[in-house]
Amino acid sequence: VNMFLSSVLVKTVVCGRQYIPKEGPYIVAINHFHIFDPALVAYSIRKPISFLAASDQEIEWYVVLAGKLYGFIPTNRTHLAPSTIKKALQALTRGDILGIFPEATSGFALRKPKKGVTYLSIKSACKILPVGVIGLDDIWNNWFRGVRPKVSVRIGKPFSVPEKFPPDRNKREKMLSDIGNDIMCHIAALLPESRHGDYAGNQKIGYYKD
């Protein structure tokens, strides 16, 4: 399915495959602009990925089907339950690849990440592979017009985050916020400026660009 969508229905251009680790475990952190983002990422990484997928909203049948095909761990976007964290950590302990959308919702431009996903990134002590996907916005209109849209998937250099939380609660909250924003800046560096959203003008983005 990933191959059919990414190489037949759309023209997918992938940059940065040299940065993909040879083996897991690691976390793939992706912007979320469209429901087909997981398919494009799975095609680009070319390895099995378990995605954290929203379970707290009504979704279309084809999204449910896609989730079953990709492999997904259901999660509540407003509260990352202990059972979800446990399943995600178990997957990483097995050496699997975990796909996360830090914003936990789709939109036109980048938004602030949810703390639960940031917490998981720290708790797992795994490297994070940032990925930016762009070009799916008008996919339905293009298909109806008989146009095969061009989609860009950019893969950045993997990076690490601190592995321990400070005992002080205020410092812990600040750490979650800072690391979450840092993850988003790595993703923003792979996207055009018009999509930087809440991170527009952030100086870290230029530092993280190739």
Q: Model-found features: residue ranges?
A:
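N-terminal membrane-anchoring alpha-helices
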Residues: 1-13, 204-207
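A conditional alpha-helix N-cap/helix-loop micro-motif detector
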Residues: 10, 78-82, 110, 169
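Catalytic core of membrane glycerolipid acyltransferases/transacylases, capturing the structured
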Residues: 7-8, 15, 20-79, 87, ...
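Short, basic, glycine/proline-bearing loop/turn elements
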Residues: 1-2, 69-75, 101-105
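A cross-family acyltransferase "interaction/gating" segment
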Residues: 108-174, 178, 204-207
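Residue-level preference for the first positions of well-ordered beta-strands
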Residues: 25-27, 95-101, 129
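Catalytic-site beta-strand/loop segments enriched in glycine and acidic/polar residues
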Residues: 89-118
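Short, highly charged C-terminal tails/helix-capping segments
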Residues: 195-210
